């Protein structure tokens, strides 16, 4: 389930993106951009 996937992603320090009925494209794109900055800086 989604909670397990979130825990897995957190444990392995990987990005998890969730697209569901509540997803709005502009905010989703913003989140992807910010995640790219965050995860890119951890390399």
Curated annotation (Swiss-Prot):
Gene Ontology biological process terms in this record: L-arabinose catabolic process to xylulose 5-phosphate
InterPro entries named among the record's database cross-references: Fuc/Ara_isomerase_C, Lara_isomerase
An annotated Gene Ontology molecular function: L-arabinose isomerase activity
Transmembrane segments: none
The keyword Heme appears for this protein: no
EC number: 5.3.1.4
Pathway named in the protein's UniProt entry: Carbohydrate degradation; L-arabinose degradation via L-ribulose; D-xylulose 5-phosphate from L-arabinose (bacterial route): step 1/3
Keywords: Arabinose catabolism, Carbohydrate metabolism, Isomerase
Catalytic activity: beta-L-arabinopyranose = L-ribulose
GO cellular component labels: cytosol
Keyword Isomerase: yes
Domain of life the protein comes from: Bacteria
Family: Belongs to the arabinose isomerase family.
Function: Catalyzes the conversion of L-arabinose to L-ribulose.
Subunit structure: Homohexamer.
Name of the protein this chain belongs to: L-arabinose isomerase
Organism per entry: Klebsiella pneumoniae
Gene: araA
